[in-house]
Amino acid sequence: MDSVKNILLEYGLRFQEPQIEKVDKYIEELLGVPYNLTAHRDLDSAVHKNVVEILLPLKEELKGTLLDVGSGNGVPGLILAIFFSKLKVVLLDSREKSVNFLRGVIEKLDLENVSVVKERAENFSKERREEFDYVTARAVARLNVLVEICTPALKTGGKLLFYKGPSYIEELKEAQRAMKELKVELEKVREYSLKTGERRALLILRKYESSPEKYPRRVGVPFKRPLL
């Protein structure tokens, strides 16, 4: 079985030994949790899905403040915090089980640049408007919903980093109204493939103007009645 270090080396990803040690501990914790927090039961699958998939499309250093919406098991926010020490990361999730897991992992990994908040994204984005340099999410919702619940917390000029699968083209078409309403534009798409055969894309959107105060709408509405 490959080690975390060997898998990252296969992809030419750069790292320092302390980062590998933290990822090792994180994967160990991840593989020990119940099935409702992760579907991965082996190291190779867990590293590909939760580490390689996050780092591979990133070409620049991330620094400043980052919000991970619907963080779940800590991906992508926790991984970004480990590999980009100049980032100050907030992991946001409304589920008690996820929040408890994340707090435990942060303590065990001794991560000083990460905090956890238990709240719905709609409430958090309204309360913490224009605060973050980056907002990221993976496997939380379709793009039009993400744009509404994430963009208000983003600074003008900041970037949305959304990890998507091959269906992102359809989601982009569907999200045009939301992007216009929330004042964001697509900056670039980075398509990439894992050696497992899976195809992925990182969508990078830039906020060019402050979002209207009416967004996000109240809890649940963006999911039930998305902007189309």
UniProtKB/Swiss-Prot annotation:
InterPro entries: rRNA_ssu_MeTfrase_G, SAM-dependent_MTases_sf
Localization, UniProt: Cytoplasm
UniProt keyword list: Cytoplasm, Methyltransferase, rRNA processing, S-adenosyl-L-methionine, Transferase
GO CC term (a single one): cytosol
Segments crossing the lipid bilayer: none
EC identifiers of the protein: 2.1.1.-
Top-level taxonomic group: Bacteria
Gene3D superfamilies in the cross-refs: Vaccinia Virus protein VP39
Residues that hold S-adenosyl-L-methionine according to the record: G70, A121, E122, R138
SUPFAM superfamilies: S-adenosyl-L-methionine-dependent methyltransferases
GO MF entries: rRNA (guanine-N7-)-methyltransferase activity
Pfam families linked to this entry: GidB
Entries under NCBIfam families matching the protein: rsmG_gidB
Role, per record: Specifically methylates the N7 position of a guanine in 16S rRNA.
Family under the similarity heading: Belongs to the methyltransferase superfamily. RNA methyltransferase RsmG family.
Name the record gives this protein: Ribosomal RNA small subunit methyltransferase G
Protein's gene: rsmG
